[in-house]
């Protein structure tokens, strides 16, 4: 059992640590605007926040941390911003992977990665290769990821198996669909997030893990992502500890 010490408050036990946490990292641009800085500086600060949160989650015993790094819809942003964001994984992996490796963190990526710029793709591959034998927390980047696209592709794969008589339609189950989703590479027990956190005060999923989040608990905070550090993660988990997950039952 972990003990979280809140400032000027009593110690709060963390008896339930969510095995899989998903984070929609939102608010980088607004963080920069408040400080009269270019939007790209908010993305850079967000990268530093991710490193701190990852190490904190690993220390708490979280098994999987899935972070929404870049959606399929984000390509519509200004070209200069997209170019900068695409370079962030290169900087993140080069700067922080040695420390993540020391903490037994394994890096993994889901999304349509073949459409990424070569430098981004290569940096991603290097990070995954370096950490592939680690047995600790899985840092799962959703990069060029879209939930509806993921489900659509799963349906196409299953339909093709039916067309080729490899599969009977009556044999299609929820587990079968899940096995065709990008999260099928995660440990079976941890594929679906127990807790999804969204920063910046927005109250929506934005196409993030729509299938996998069916029974997730949600935590929305007005804190902008670059300001979401170790203490904010603890607050989210304290809130999670106060929930009673019923999974549709009473």
UniProtKB/Swiss-Prot annotation:
The active site is at 26, 74 (proton acceptor). InterPro entries: UPP_synth-like (IPR001441), UPP_synth-like_CS (IPR018520), UPP_synth-like_sf (IPR036424). GO terms for biological process: polyprenol biosynthetic process. Binds 2 magnesium ions per subunit. Its EC number is 2.5.1.-. CDD domains: Cis_IPPS. The keyword Amino-acid biosynthesis does not apply. It is an enzyme of class 2 (transferase). Substrate binds at residues 27-31, 39, 43, 71-73, 75, 77, 198, 204-206. It comes from the Bacteria. Pfam families: Prenyltransf. This is Isoprenyl transferase. It comes from Streptococcus agalactiae serotype V (strain ATCC BAA-611 / 2603 V/R).
